[in-house]
Amino acid sequence: MASGDTLYIATDGSEMPAEIVELHEIEVETIPVETIETTVVGEEEEEDDDDEDGGGGDHGGGGGGHGHAGHHHHHHHHHHHHPPMIALQPLVTDDPTQVHHHQEVILVQTREEVVGGDDSDGLRAEDGFEDQILIPVPAPAGGDDDYIEQTLVTVAAAGKSGGGASSGGGRVKKGGGKKSGKKSYLGGGAGAAGGGGADPGNKKWEQKQVQIKTLEGEFSVTMWSSDEKKDIDHETVVEEQIIGENSPPDYSEYMTGKKLPPGGIPGIDLSDPKQLAEFARMKPRKIKEDDAPRTIACPHKGCTKMFRDNSAMRKHLHTHGPRVHVCAECGKAFVESSKLKRHQLVHTGEKPFQCTFEGCGKRFSLDFNLRTHVRIHTGDRPYVCPFDGCNKKFAQSTNLKSHILTHAKAKNNQ
């Protein structure tokens, strides 16, 4: 702008000619907008897609502002890589074609952490990153696993899941084509912690001393507790329970021969897979004559296990702690290192458990699978249909559950 124009404006009194105002508006002030945009590598997704194992965490930052100055990105993103910590805020613009970019704020926060969700045995701790995304856009179609609320959610952008943001639409979608078998890619689940002791839902774990009252007296135990919810039942004191009084009913006897009452079990709909799973949840236990009654309950809320003595209950308590032993191959997490070592046999192909029946010799990675296999030879079918008039038996509990569903659904249709 000419210096004479500047002096004219400064010396003018109260009013400014319209022509001069127009000259001021011609001086386009878009440099700050473009500067902000060039700090976000908007098209880096194309490079990251070629290396999904390391770039999943950057996907969440590319969607919010791709349409504002995409041609500027093209000149910059090949020359440098920004740190994965990106804060992308919606830009103020009068262009009606860019309104959809006002709908979201994407915060990408990178840290190495075990990430998980619904399936506590399927926690993931890969070399990928964790994105925290605030998204007030409608949840994408595709089932419960893809549902994203309008809140700050944790998305595991691990390489195998390929999770990230779409570069053009301001929406979040799952990438990577085929879905992984894990269900734990949205955080906030009930899983336990790993890595640095932090849970997928940013749950903080601590050990607490809890007083337990029994008929033999009081004693204290150390147990894990998280800040997400009250894991300890009955505040800090757990009274001893006597089986048959306050403890939940044990339905395992119906899985091993006892028939259901004519009217069924009140309050249980066996045609509902969830209720059926609860019905068949407890494994049948062989009762010995010298078996002492199990009178001491686990103090963790939601756990119904009972124990014969204090030491047995103490041994059990650590199973409610953080799952810090993580399989590098698939991301499953375990409380005990021995369980992780046993699980890793599945990936190594090692099969140390061999069937000893003559002429068989089949080998298995897990002892559980061998025990199930042996029933083929022995003819042992310990799982019996509980419906009156049906005497079918099964070698595996899963087969019995499927069979029970056919009875229950047929009964409901009558």
UniProtKB/Swiss-Prot annotation:
Region (Involved in repression of activated transcription), start-end ranges: 333-371
Position of the Glycyl lysine isopeptide (Lys-Gly) (interchain with G-Cter in SUMO2) cross-link: K182, K183, K208, K230, K286, K288, K409, K411
Q: Where is the region Involved in masking transactivation domain? A: 371-397
Gene Ontology cellular component terms for the protein in this record:
chromatin; chromatin silencing complex; cytoplasm; Ino80 complex; nuclear matrix; nucleoplasm; nucleus; PcG protein complex
Q: Which GO terms describe its molecular function?
A: chromatin binding; DNA binding; DNA-binding transcription activator activity, RNA polymerase II-specific; DNA-binding transcription factor activity; DNA-binding transcription factor binding; DNA-binding transcription repressor activity, RNA polymerase II-specific; four-way junction DNA binding; RNA binding
Protein name, entry field: Transcriptional repressor protein YY1
Q: Which InterPro entries match?
A: YY1-like, Znf_C2H2_sf, Znf_C2H2_type
- Where is this chain compositionally biased, Basic residues type? 68-83, 171-182
Q: What is its main location?
A: nucleus
Q: Where is this site: Cleavage?
A: D121, G122
Q: What family name appears in the similarity comment?
A: Belongs to the YY transcription factor family.
Keyword Transport (UniProt): no
Binding-site positions, Zn(2+) 2: C327, C330, H343, H347
Give start-end positions of Acidic residues composition bias: 42-55
Q: Where is this region: Binding to DNA?
A: 295-414
Q: Please list the residues that bind Zn(2+) 1.
A: C298, C303, H316, H320
* Region described as Interaction with the SMAD1/SMAD4 complex: 1-170
Q: Where is this region: Disordered?
A: 32-83, 159-203
> What PTM annotation applies here?
Transiently poly-ADP-ribosylated by PARP1 upon DNA damage, with the effect of decreasing affinity of YY1 to its cognate DNA binding sites.
